[in-house]
């Protein structure tokens, strides 16, 4: 279920301040954030945001087609290493 249109998209205030400061700065650097719940706005395009996945910060370069999605969608929290090998083959 999506967010109500009358509320509008959500972005953490501290992240928005960092993005605005970064767009005004001449030298761009990586913005670290723990806010996986924030929606990507159009003024985030072209910035690199390091999103925390519970273990480390994953750098996410924001592109045009990411607008409207959440930051957490681009930093997976679980690492899939495949299923365990079938022991039946090795016993024969």
Swiss-Prot record:
Recite the UniProt keywords alphabetically. Answer: Ribonucleoprotein, Ribosomal protein, RNA-binding, rRNA-binding
Q: One Pfam family this chain carries?
A: Ribosomal_S19
**What Gene3D superfamilies does the database record attribute to this sequence?**
30s Ribosomal Protein S19, Chain A (3.30.860.10)
Could you confirm whether the keyword rRNA-binding appears in this record? yes
By its UniProt entry, which SUPFAM superfamilies does this protein fall under?
Ribosomal protein S19
Segments spanning the bilayer are: none
- GO annotation, cellular component aspect: cytoplasm; small ribosomal subunit
Q: Which GO terms describe its biological process?
A: ribosomal small subunit assembly; translation
The source's superkingdom equals: Bacteria
Segment forming the signal sequence: none
Question: Which Gene Ontology molecular-function terms are recorded?
Answer: rRNA binding; structural constituent of ribosome
InterPro entries hit by this protein: Ribosomal_uS19 (IPR002222), Ribosomal_uS19_bac-type (IPR005732), Ribosomal_uS19_CS (IPR020934), Ribosomal_uS19_SF (IPR023575)
Q: What is this protein for, i.e. what is its function?
A: Protein S19 forms a complex with S13 that binds strongly to the 16S ribosomal RNA.
Recorded family membership: Belongs to the universal ribosomal protein uS19 family.
Q: What is this protein called?
A: Small ribosomal subunit protein uS19
Origin organism is Lactococcus lactis subsp. cremoris (strain MG1363)
């Amino acid at each position: 279920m999506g967010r109500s249109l009358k509320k509008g998209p959500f972005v953490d205030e501290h992240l928005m301040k960092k993005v605005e400061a970064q767009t005004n700065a001449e030298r761009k650097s990586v913005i670290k954030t723990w806010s996986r719940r924030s929606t990507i706005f159009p003024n985030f395009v072209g910035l690199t945001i390091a999103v925390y996945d519970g273990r480390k910060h994953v750098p996410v370069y924001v592109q045009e087609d990411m607008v409207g999605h959440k930051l957490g969608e681009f930093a997976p929290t679980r690492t899939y290493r495949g299923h365990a090998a079938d022991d039946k083959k090795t016993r024969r």
